[in-house]
Curated annotation (Swiss-Prot):
InterPro entries (alphabetical): Fmt (IPR005794), Formyl_trans_C (IPR005793), Formyl_transf_N (IPR002376), Formyl_transf_N_sf (IPR036477), Formyl_transferase-like_C_sf (IPR011034), Met-tRNA-FMT_C (IPR044135), Met-tRNA-FMT_N (IPR041711)
Keyword Transferase attributed: yes
EC number(s) on file: 2.1.2.9
Regions crossing the membrane: none
Similarity field: Belongs to the Fmt family.
Binding site for (6S)-5,6,7,8-tetrahydrofolate: 114-117
Job of this protein: Attaches a formyl group to the free amino group of methionyl-tRNA(fMet). The formyl group appears to play a dual role in the initiator identity of N-formylmethionyl-tRNA by promoting its recognition by IF2 and preventing the misappropriation of this tRNA by the elongation apparatus.
Name of the protein described by the UniProt record: Methionyl-tRNA formyltransferase
PANTHER family noted in UniProt: METHIONYL-TRNA FORMYLTRANSFERASE, METHIONYL-TRNA FORMYLTRANSFERASE, MITOCHONDRIAL
Reaction(s) catalysed by this chain's protein: L-methionyl-tRNA(fMet) + (6R)-10-formyltetrahydrofolate = N-formyl-L-methionyl-tRNA(fMet) + (6S)-5,6,7,8-tetrahydrofolate + H(+)
Record-level GO cellular component terms: cytosol
Length: 315
């Protein structure tokens, strides 16, 4: 099939590469405009744009798809000229307006990193870890006017591991989901897919803010563990000590915590080779900490450097 791929960040690159390597033809990509990154705040193309350029694929970077904008009108004209059979989408980042939904015979097909209708919205991977799901996956569905409400085309499952961070899980789903997207394109072309409506109660995973990532030490240890992993690497789980904000990496699972179980929530006990923190249930051993303006470091090394007193407590 002739495809126009819509996507922007690194996870979308995996799917795009798999489509390029498939029997389908990617005739153009839609991606977000160049954005300022790095210390110099210089403009850089998206990860998807870079890959497309390497393969000589046309790159379209509209600031908006709305019909009443200059970019929106130009995109409509170009899509009509390209005449795609389908527009696969992975984390594009722009609203696809109603009048564009029927621009191709097979419409727009989104790869979403959850088993819909679970975790509709912007942060399904983080939500599935944070809420303690054991099984998640990826779904391809046809985009309609709702928020991730379209008919399901294909799914694939994945088991969430006890130490998975959001980055770990997203990386796996990007690869398995990329394969699923290729299979979906082939199935649509061959007429072997039967779309089905989403069934069951929907849950929602809204975009995560920095404030959402703050650790509440009064929560049970397993909840804090999931919270930290769900926000690793971004935006990064964090806590405060006095007036300093520190990012906290995934906890250590290397051994048992040999301290009194009544360590108060947030209370810090620095041992020779570990840092233990009280929670609402049992204490946990920190893995890494990132002080302001520094790189992530071993928690025990951090504790030796700041010389914690006996009353030290995370807030």
């Amino acid at each position: 099939m002739r495809l126009v791929f819509a996507g922007t960040p690194e996870p979308a690159v995996v799917a795009l590469q798999k489509l390029i390597d498939s029997d389908h033809e990617v005739v153009a990509v839609l991606t977000q405009p160049d954005a300022r990154r790095g210390r110099g705040r210089t403009l850089h193309p998206s990860a998807v744009a870079e890959l497309a350029q390497q393969h000589g694929i046309e790159v379209l970077k509209p600031t908006s798809l709305k019909a009443d904008t200059e970019d929106g009108q130009a995109i409509r004209q170009r899509l009509a000229e390209l005449a795609p059979d389908c527009l696969p989408v992975v984390a594009y980042g722009q609203l696809i307006t109603k009048d564009l939904l029927d621009v191709a015979p097979h419409g727009w097909v989104n790869l979403h990193f959850s088993l819909l209708p679970a975790w509709r919205g912007a942060a399904p991977v983080q939500a599935s870890i944070r809420e303690g799901d054991q099984i998640t996956g990826a779904t391809t569905f046809r985009i309609d006017e709702g928020l991730d409400t379209g008919v399901i085309l294909s799914t694939i499952e994945d088991t969430i591991q006890p130490t998975d961070t959001a980055d770990d899980l997203l990386t796996r789903l990007a690869y398995s989901g990329g394969d699923l997207l290729v299979e979906t394109m082939t199935g649509l072309e061959q007429g072997t897919i039967t779309p089905r409506a989403q069934e069951g109660e929907a849950t929602y995973a809204s975009k995560i803010t920095t404030q959402d990532a703050q650790i509440d030490w009064s929560k049970p240890a397993e909840v804090i563990d999931r919270h930290i992993r769900a926000h690793t690497p971004g935006p990064g789980a964090w806590t405060t000590l006095v007036d300093a904000r520190l990012k906290v990496g995934p906890i250590s699972h290397s051994g048992e915590v040999e301290v009194a179980a009544d360590l108060a929530p947030g209370a810090i006990l620095a041992q020779k080779n570990s840092v233990v923190v009280g929670t609402g249930t049992t204490p946990i051993v920190l893995g890494n900490i990132q002080p302001p303006g520094k790189k992530m470091m071993n928690a025990a090394d951090w504790a030796r450097g700041v010389q914690l007193d006996q009353e030290a407590k995370f807030q």
